[in-house]
Structure formats: C-alpha cells, structure tokens
Amino acid sequence: MIMPLINGLKITLKHMFMKPVTLQYPDERPTPSPNFRGLHALKVSHSKAKCVCCYLCPTVCPAKCITVEAGEDQEHNKYAERYEIDMLRCIFCGYCVEACPVDALKMTGEFELANYKREDFVFVKERLLEK
C-alpha cells in the first residue's frame, strides 16, 4: 500500500525539477529551427526582385495560392509585374522555393500570421520584398 505511493512521489519529484516545456508566449519567443517553413519572402538582387517570371512556382503549388503576371523591361527581360501569395490557402509545403530556378523565393522563420481582415492575408510583391 505504501510502495505505490512512494513510486508516485518519485515520479512527481523527478518531473518537478525538469526544464519546463511550456513557453509564456508573448514574453518568451520561441526560436524556430533552421528548417522551419514560415512566411514567404522574395529575394532582391541589384535593387530588383530576382524573380524572372518562369511560372514554376504557381505551377508546382498544390494549393494554387500563387498568382504571377509577367512584364518586360527595355532589354526584353521578363520580371514579375504582379506577384501575390494568398496565405489563407497556402499549406507551407515549400515546393515553390524548391522549384525556383533563380532562388528568388525563400521561406523565413516568421510565424506570426494574425490579422483582422482577409485582405491582409494576400501578400503582394511589395510586402514580400519587405521581409
């Protein structure tokens, strides 16, 4: 009768001195792992987005959340005139980043996605360049 009580107390004391798993979120920020797939961002090269508008990212996206429209500059080089990602549809799989031939898209470690309006979840080109 006393042995189960002692075994239970042993387990309780062992767990009492372990490092806590829970973080007090607004005060303590978790650090995501290096492989964490967070919010998307466009990379910049020579003060322009690196995207050459090859349409591989919207083609490979299983959620169909990426919209790209091409434009041409004076040297007839293609660039993304319109680049949008609907974060409400995105499943954060990372296929768009893997498919990009010029490494123009990356996934950041940012994970806070709270907003009040649905329109704020559609990330346009300018917002993707800020990250």
From Swiss-Prot:
Keywords: 4Fe-4S, Cell inner membrane, Cell membrane, Iron, Iron-sulfur, Membrane, Metal-binding, NAD, Quinone, Repeat, Translocase, Ubiquinone
Membrane topology: Peripheral membrane protein
Domain of life assignment: Bacteria
Pfam families the UniProt entry points to: Fer4 (PF00037)
Domain annotation 4Fe-4S ferredoxin-type: ranges: 42-71, 81-110
Subcellular location as annotated: Cell inner membrane
Binding site for [4Fe-4S] cluster 2: C61, C90, C93, C96
Cofactor: binding comment: Binds 2 [4Fe-4S] clusters per subunit.
Catalyses which reaction(s): a quinone + NADH + 5 H(+)(in) = a quinol + NAD(+) + 4 H(+)(out)
Gene Ontology cellular component annotations, sorted alphabetically: plasma membrane
Record Gene3D superfamilies: 3.30.70.3270
Annotated residues for binding of [4Fe-4S] cluster 1: C51, C54, C57, C100
EC number assigned by the record: 7.1.1.-
GO molecular function terms attached to this record: 4 iron, 4 sulfur cluster binding; iron ion binding; NADH:ubiquinone reductase (non-electrogenic) activity; quinone binding
SUPFAM superfamilies (UniProt xref): 4Fe-4S ferredoxins
Cofactor dependency: [4Fe-4S] cluster
Subunit and partners: NDH-1 is composed of 14 different subunits. Subunits NuoA, H, J, K, L, M, N constitute the membrane sector of the complex.
Family: Belongs to the complex I 23 kDa subunit family.
Main function: NDH-1 shuttles electrons from NADH, via FMN and iron-sulfur (Fe-S) centers, to quinones in the respiratory chain. The immediate electron acceptor for the enzyme in this species is believed to be ubiquinone. Couples the redox reaction to proton translocation (for every two electrons transferred, four hydrogen ions are translocated across the cytoplasmic membrane), and thus conserves the redox energy in a proton gradient.
Protein name per UniProt: NADH-quinone oxidoreductase subunit I 2
